[in-house]
Amino acid sequence: MKGRLLDAVPLSSLTGVGAAQSNKLAKINLHTVQDLLLHLPLRYEDRTHLYPIGELLPGVYATVEGEVLNCNISFGGRRMMTCQISDGSGILTMRFFNFNAAMKNSLATGRRVLAYGEAKRGKYGAEMIHPEYRVQGDLSTPELQETLTPVYPTTEGVKQATLRKLTDQALDLLDTCAIEELLPPELSQGMMTLPEALRTLHRPPPTLQLSDLETGQHPAQRRLILEELLAHNLSMLALRAGAQRFHAQPLSANDALKNKLLAALPFKPTGAQARVVAEIERDMALDAPMMRLVQGDVGSGKTLVAAIAALRAIAHGKQVALMAPTELLAEQHANNFRNWFAPLGIEVGWLAGKQKGKARLAQQEAIASGQVQMIVGTHAIFQEQVQFNGLALVIIDEQHRFGVHQRLALWEKGQQQGFHPHQLIMTATPIPRTLAMTAYADLDTSVIDELPPGRTPVTTVAIPDTRRNDIIDRVRHACMTEGRQAYWVCTLIEESELLEAQAAEATWEELKLALPELNVGLVHGRMKPAEKQAVMASFKQGELHLLVATTVIEVGVDVPNASLMIIENPERLGLAQLHQLRGRVGRGAVASHCVLLYKTPLSKTAQIRLQVLRDSNDGFVIAQKDLEIRGPGELLGTRQTGNAEFKVADLLRDQAMIPEVQRLARHIHERYPQQAKALIERWMPETERYSNA
């Protein structure tokens, strides 16, 4: 038996990890040596052989070696250092925008340099921007890497080189310490051991096929993917078992309020809406808490379904809480529910972070006394000081913004007198069946697969940025001649609200100049909620012709007169998000258009993506296509499933394993409860506390 277990060895025991470094590593959930070993590379770089400079092709990542010919600093539009090296077959220009005197001195003429980076075609031949480089000693042969070089997910202040050095130490510890094998012997037979798999994935030998690693097919990956998917499924089984131990208030049929609401509507619910309502009502009549996910495409009428579910609870004298991810969306829900419920004598309350002082206190008192039966708001409705009076149903809108942990915390909060509230979760992001089986294995699923009559399909076109002026003319025509309104959406690669806001402000200034006859508004994530609400209100009332926005308008904004949307750089967004954005138009009876204003050249994947949007308005078709065309390295993150990203598994790539994993998870859950618990702790520690609830 080896020494102590690596899940008990803190990272601070490694050389080079002091208090400051520990805090940085904690930001990416790295606390123990086991955590570090399970923090696997995103991709690999092959630095094991040299490329002749003369044979470099644009877009190829390569290691080159050459002699420094010159190194100069220029002070044009931007301070820059350029260094040229030659290996006899050609000359490479290395460009640096961030540099210091020590770097300049190290690149003295005549020195030999080993450089790695992406080759580009420059003005004077091959170029690399900010390559990694090392000045060679007097060795006649360059010091190349012996294994493929891992590239890890990281955080600010933690360099790749640091993670590689720490991982080297962690791999050495595998010789003296143990990492526990948790798979039952009948499952792990014929598979790589955990230490073998970890060594292979952190330091793959150059003989290993990169294509196997990129597609997730290597036996070392399969070993860990199986374990992670099992842990995920076991956590869902534990959550489900936990939920079934609880009791909810059974809410039997009591349809007087529902019938009044339906009689007052100017339309009849679709067959799909009626079917989903029946599924929800069946759940709510039981004494176990309902945990149901309702998927409906953009505009399929999920809100009406939620309203009917709410009336079932209110008819029994109980309260209902609806939580939305943004104040904008919450306010819109509050308005919809007031319009429907006020004629029925039901009071709708509204709670958001921006409410202060007396108004907030008055609202809290009205909730605590039971005067308000329907409460709508953001996550502010589940803060400590909000006391409910018989909360029987919780509705969460836009599940992929909340995630499993918030869903469960909210459920705990709603517990009163031994009863847990029923839970209804609504998402407009259609989830293909395989993903729903895994990501929402703790929920029952309903699908509203029919759009209400009278919706006009949106015509989508893709146009290059070179025709920007034509599109600006089209906006002018739509707003001035046709009396319509339009959205202009700015997107960014970086998940940075600041940069996104700056991009939107620059576009807003440009469009105000180009369209002086239009009232142009601006909304982005860094504005105060009240400012955002004011802009959206004036757009909804028709005071603004054109709204420049970031992707904050992705969910729930309803302006029927808006019939034109321009999305800049659509190639930067996933299909599901583009489909969500497009759903903001086509809400009235007028023909609506969405223009995908892309920058050339487009990658092959981006071309296919944009084509899918042009061909289809069906969110389920689009979600299925998304599965088929996403590259192997694209992980499914919080945006699309409500779950934290997987470390090794990829629900899209590994979907064929899921039915078998579910069978094995049930086997482990029943036969090996201790291993099941340990697997959840290893891969999904946050879920553990809920499964023990």
Question: What function would you assign to each model-found segment?
Answer:
Residues 42-62:
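Short boundary/loop segments of OB/S1/cold-shock single-stranded nucleic-acid-binding domains
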Residues 601-693:
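C-terminal accessory region of SF2 helicases/translocases
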Residues 275-278, 289-611, 667, 671-675, ...:
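Inter-lobe coupling/hinge segments of SF2-like helicase ATPases
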Residues 267-277:
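N-terminal pre-Walker A segment at the start of P-loop NTPase domains
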Residues 58-79, 117:
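Structural detector for short beta-strands of small beta-barrel domains
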Residues 1-14, 23-26, 232, 242:
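Long, highly charged, low-complexity intrinsically disordered interaction regions
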Residues 74-264, 638, 671:
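Upstream accessory/linker segments immediately N-terminal to the RecA-like ATPase cores of bacterial MutS
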